């Protein structure tokens, strides 16, 4: 035998004193390798696109206390403004645009009406494989009318046969954050995956402010001394607790002839947020809060080489059912010291126990046809329906009473694009 050749064995019988000449032929050892697939990273692909786009490699930030929103602040032109501690209201700006001008997607699926628990400042960085930021003009595949841009959270779809990822952190103001992700891909292609995370914080940090003092007389009436704004006190926040929990379950199959990926997922989230102040810091609330939950099933189907080679199909559908309650029913008035007196009317700001219900469903069809390595045609159609209803749960009868007109939005967006990419150094997109 020899290195690189097959081993050959032959039996030879010799009589005493006999000599025999034996010819031995050895053949080269050929080993058939499995299919080798060469791919480029999603981060590099986005950064080289013709769009004004940047991709952040989230894997480099895994197992840190960073959130998706915190990672986005590393992108030029992206600004984050939070009104307080953990779970506070957040505004994300892309080149000066915010609000409805900036849309959020997860794996290309729009997240309108997903609920406060899935705000970017509440989702841990481990949930994402990478974060794509498109500024201004966006690919037709998103099918959105966002003039400011799009943020697309891309999760890890190739985790391995079996995986487990978990993290926990504890910080100031009794802040707890935890995350766990586990799943398995079996030999027959069946897969399951579970993601779960939670955030909790008392948010009892100190503020420097003046205090509206009061005195309760013997007859029960309340006297208000003149407000002295020159006296500033160092006091703790006492009605600003926040917590949220979310679970994302997913089952499906991968690597089948009829589907490269078929996955059904179900998301559930809950949040509770106490409200310390209103627009003005000197107006303090001691019992006002907001809570809500969200249910969101979704379906994803992906097939390469559909009917003909180089024709890829992606179908997605999701439904978000989000319910939020704003509760302000206390008959007390508080100051920054946590002191209170009883009022003759209910409601620290405005008497309410309201319910807002969001129903949102989306369907996406996206087809890519590749001609060689340089030409790509993309067709996309997105249909969406959003409905919001609000009602109040107050009154002696404790019955639901409508107090606003339902808000309904329906959209159908189609797009067709062509991309020419003769090399990695330059490409052209038309749509």
PLM regions: where:
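Face-selective signature of the C-terminal outer-membrane beta-barrel domain
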Residues: 248-271, 290-431
């Amino acid at each position: 035998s020899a290195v690189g050749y097959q081993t050959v064995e032959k039996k030879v019988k010799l009589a005493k004193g006999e000599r025999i000449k034996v010819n031995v032929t050895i053949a080269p050892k050929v080993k058939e390798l499995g299919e080798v697939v060469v791919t480029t990273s999603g981060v590099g692909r986005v950064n080289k696109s013709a769009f004004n786009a940047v991709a952040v490699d989230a894997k480099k930030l895994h197992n840190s206390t960073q959130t998706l929103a915190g990672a986005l602040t590393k992108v030029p032109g992206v600004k984050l403004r939070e009104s307080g501690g953990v779970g506070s209201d957040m505004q994300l700006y892309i080149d000066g645009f915010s609000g409805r001008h900036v849309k959020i997607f997860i794996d290309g699926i729009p997240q309108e009406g997903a609920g406060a628990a899935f705000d970017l400042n509440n989702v841990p960085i481990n949930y994402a494989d990478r974060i794509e930021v498109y500024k201004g003009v966006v690919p037709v595949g998103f099918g959105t009318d966002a003039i400011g841009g799009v943020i697309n959270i891309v999760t890890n779809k190739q985790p391995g046969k079996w995986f487990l990822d978990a993290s926990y952190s504890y910080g100031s103001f009794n802040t707890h954050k935890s995350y766990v992700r586990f799943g398995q891909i079996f030999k027959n292609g069946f897969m399951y995956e579970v993601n779960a995370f939670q955030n909790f914080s008392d948010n009892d940090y100190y503020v420097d402010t003046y205090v509206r003092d009061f005195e309760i007389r013997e007859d029960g009436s309340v006297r208000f001394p003149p407000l002295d704004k020159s006296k500033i006190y160092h006091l703790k926040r006492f009605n600003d607790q926040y917590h949220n929990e979310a679970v994302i379950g997913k089952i499906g199959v991968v690597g089948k002839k009829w589907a490269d990926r078929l996955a059904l997922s179900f998301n559930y989230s809950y949040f509770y947020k106490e409200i310390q102040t209103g627009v003005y810091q000197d107006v303090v609330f001691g019992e006002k809060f907001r809570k809500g939950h969200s249910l969101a099933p979704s379906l994803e189907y992906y097939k390469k080489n559909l009917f003909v080679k180089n024709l890829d199909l992606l179908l997605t559908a999701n439904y978000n059912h989000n319910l939020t309650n704003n509760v302000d029913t206390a008959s007390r008035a508080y100051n920054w010291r946590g002191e209170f007196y009883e009022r003759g009317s209910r409601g620290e700001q405005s008497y309410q126990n309201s319910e807002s219900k969001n129903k949102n469903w989306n369907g996406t069809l996206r087809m890519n046809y590749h001609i060689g390595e340089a030409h790509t045609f993309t067709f996309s159609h997105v249909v969406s329906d959003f409905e919001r209803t609000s009602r109040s749960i107050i009154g002696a009868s404790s019955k639901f009473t409508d107090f606003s007109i339902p808000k309904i939005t329906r959209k159908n967006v189609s797009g067709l694009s062509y991309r020419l990419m003769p090399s990695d150094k330059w490409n052209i997109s038309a749509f």
